């Protein structure tokens, strides 16, 4: 039986600044959910940023929603599936919901002696690892960083782009590393449909995809863009649920989907989107939100499902952190092993997380 829910707040620095079209991150304000029962526990990680720049959610807001609305929904016997049904009454707040769902899943699967990978239906024991490269100060810096990641064994490179820092940089990387390297770009909604002719210039570089070129709300605009750009369009920020994913596919707004559990409300909804795409022959891949090992472990389990045919952003721990809160994930010959023990397969290292933690709030479950 569940006895209490803990909200753990902590802080971790990134090994280097990570710049996108909308922000530069140098650290992460962490929010973990810990479900504590009589003889077991479960952990979930909230992926929201400190400010509402990627989406409308932000980490302090997620904590408030958890405390005021989501945790009071949980009883001693609530399962992840039941929580998803109950929390549907609260609009949006997908990242807050996803963190609690993940902790409940970890808890109940540990009690059932089952791994998250097996629960979701994973068919792979390791997943191909790609890496996301932030916008660099110069092209020379970009080439140096890409070379380092290639040396580390990453099988796919993703370049963050924005207007004015796109075509020349992609050309430089393609020329430096050859036509066979798996390469894609991510705009994080930095362009408009009026930029279609400009984005079409990317077609010559044989990219896997262009990720989220237009604003989140402009799904219809992506339909028009898909007609004018030869490179496959992948949606990220726009896809916030199964229903949105189905609608986007129905109108041909994209031909690839990036599934991020935090963005869609959790791993159960992520699996529904995966199953939809698999049934339609639409490739998916697992995106990243600079997760520590707790979130990364769960993402690896998801990325091991059969429809995840493109390398995701499930990079090694050292890509982002000098010291992760869990035993670090390592890349070996381009792949990262999927945790195969119970639950998400990892737990935080008590001493490490303790040194990073600023506050732990505990909420008793009495009903």
What are these model-derived regions, one by one?
Residues 5, 322-367:
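C-terminal extensions of enzymes
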Residues 117-229:
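Metal-dependent enolase-superfamily TIM-barrel catalytic cores that perform enediolate-based chemistry
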Residues 1-9, 110, 114-126, 329, ...:
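N-terminal amphipathic alpha-helix/helix-capping segment at the start of soluble metabolic enzymes
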Residues 1-41, 47-54, 320-322, 363:
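Structured beta-strand/loop patches that form or line metal/cofactor-binding pockets in enzymes
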Residues 33, 39, 100, 113, ...:
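Conserved, mostly hydrophobic/aromatic
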Residues 217-234, 239-335, 339:
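Shared catalytic-loop signature of beta/alpha-barrel
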